[in-house]
Amino acid sequence: MHSIRRHPLLEFNSNGIYCAQADVYIDPWRKVDRALITHAHADHARYGMKHYLTTSGSALIMRERIGQSLSIETTKYGQKHTIGGVTFSFHPAGHVLGSAMIRVEHKGEVWVASGDYKIGHDSFGNHFEPIPCHTFITESTFGLPVFLSLIHI
């Protein structure tokens, strides 16, 4: 049996989705030292981070879109990175080339931050991979009540 966590593994603050234990952000919207990037679209990957960690597909796009001189470390899907005792891994999100959901594990607790994802298949080949977790942080383009009429489309 796991002990109850007093603080969330991931939390939102003025810079983005923050993992205090590892001192890293996922898709931060303000300048930070370490950023884990789910994919290269402008609302997720921004200029100004000291160091980025993302997939090689996202890194290619980020360098073209943001700048060749970015400090980017690339990772493969499923490869584990341990920072401050927290294990991070990137898993296919099916959204665009290089897109990933980020799995975060600490002391047996697993959280997943989705970024954008698509469960349908296409020619990119990085098809959505369901990840068992305790907490799932997701985005929703059409999640507001004003979009209820789209449910039957």
Task: List the model feature ranges, each with a label.
Residues 2-11, 16-19, 25-29, 34, ...:
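His/Asp/Glu-rich metal-coordinating catalytic cores
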Residues 39:
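Conserved G/P- and acidic residue-centered "switch" motifs that form tight phosphate/ATP-binding loops
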